[in-house]
Amino acid sequence: MALSIKHPEADRLARALAARTGETLTEAVVTALRERLARETGRARVVPLRDELAAIRHRCAALPVVDNRSAEAILGYDERGLPA
């Protein structure tokens, strides 16, 4: 199967790589594609922090309430905010 890329920068980059490595144009392109695919395959997809925090927030909001006391009561603070 033939691959035809009509992009001036792609042509320039492929030729520069082939000249630097001593490979044919085809070898340079195939090697570059293999290396990029290997990097992408081994890399975990990065989830934006905002999305990750939203997922945590949704999971926490779905948890059941197991203690109806206020946070202060659970921590043992009195009406002045001091430990009781």
UniProtKB/Swiss-Prot annotation:
Domain of life: Bacteria
Any one GO biological process: positive regulation of growth
One Pfam family this sequence matches: PSK_trans_fac
InterPro entries assigned to the protein according to its UniProt record, in alphabetical order: VapB-like (IPR011660)
Keyword line: Toxin-antitoxin system
Protein transport among keywords: no
Protein task: Antitoxin component of a type II toxin-antitoxin (TA) system. Upon expression in M.smegmatis neutralizes the effect of cognate toxin VapC30.
Protein's name in the database: Antitoxin VapB30
Organism listed in the record: Mycobacterium tuberculosis (strain ATCC 25618 / H37Rv)
Lineage of the organism: Bacteria, Bacillati, Actinomycetota, Actinomycetes, Mycobacteriales
